[in-house]
Regions:
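Extended catalytic cores of very large enzyme megasubunits
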Residues: 1-233
Length: 233
């Protein structure tokens, strides 16, 4: 069974996501709930989407979870679940606005990852979007938009919210990666060996690398790299 996401993408139905969402609503109130009751509610939601093929969307499933929580008498949990959905929607809209203003769809992916890592309200993407909007101008270039976004994050940095500095660095890192990718494409640099050779010819790397390692070894070394470590900021 497939589910339609908000962006139109299709993903395979996973009832574990429903179970996790229900558990989080109880964690938010500190109320205990048995695994059997969670399973019961998951089954009820699952039966609903099985019986209604036209409603197999993330939005409709979440609506059903709300109703299911209330039907079982868990009103406080339903209230927090609704609030959580509202905040997530706010975050999503703020990120989409920034990506639209910068004309950069990949930027949305970066900001979604940031939002998942920095969940405190003080690091809301809504706050970033509002500050960014104060710097943005109609028709500005992609570079200017990214610069404005970095500036927005920097100016949000305070003793109470110091991680905005890290978030600005994450956006700066993304801009650098884009710049490097464009240069690699222009120069036709596809393998790690080609990149090392270019850097050596430019005098940025020492000759010792190419003198001590062959092309196959250097390309193999690239497999040990973990790009996601760039996100440790």
């Amino acid at each position: 069974m497939n589910i339609t996401k908000r962006n139109g993408e299709i993903e395979v139905y996973n009832n574990e996501k429903i179970s996790i969402a229900i558990k989080k609503s109880f964690i938010s109130t500190g109320k205990d709930i048995s695994d059997s009751e969670i399973s019961e509610m998951v089954c009820e939601v699952e039966q609903f989407i099985t019986d209604n093929p036209d409603l197999r969307t993330v939005e409709d499933i979440q609506n059903r979870v709300e109703k299911c929580l209330m039907a079982h008498g868990h009103y406080d949990e339903a209230k927090n679940y609704i609030l959580f959905r509202y905040q997530r929607n706010e975050q999503r809209q703020a990120i989409n606005y920034i990506a639209w203003a910068a004309d950069d769809r990949q930027l949305a992916d970066v900001l979604h990852r940031v939002a998942r890592e920095y969940r405190e309200r003080s690091y809301s993407m809504v706050t970033l979007q509002e500050k960014f909007a104060s710097f943005s101008k109609p028709g500005m270039s992609h570079r200017d938009a990214i610069d404005a976004l970095i500036k927005a994050a920097v100016e949000l940095t305070t003793p109470e919210a110091p991680a905005w500095e890290m978030i600005s660095a994450r956006i700066l890192s993304y801009r650098s990666e884009q710049k490097i990718s464009r240069l690699e494409e222009e120069l036709g640099l596809k393998t790690f060996y080609q990149k090392v050779r270019y850097m050596t010819e430019e005098g940025l790397y020492g000759d010792y690398i190419l003198q001590n390692y062959g092309e196959e070894e250097i390309n193999e070394a690239a497999d040990f790299m973990q790009p996601d470590r760039n996100e440790l900021l």
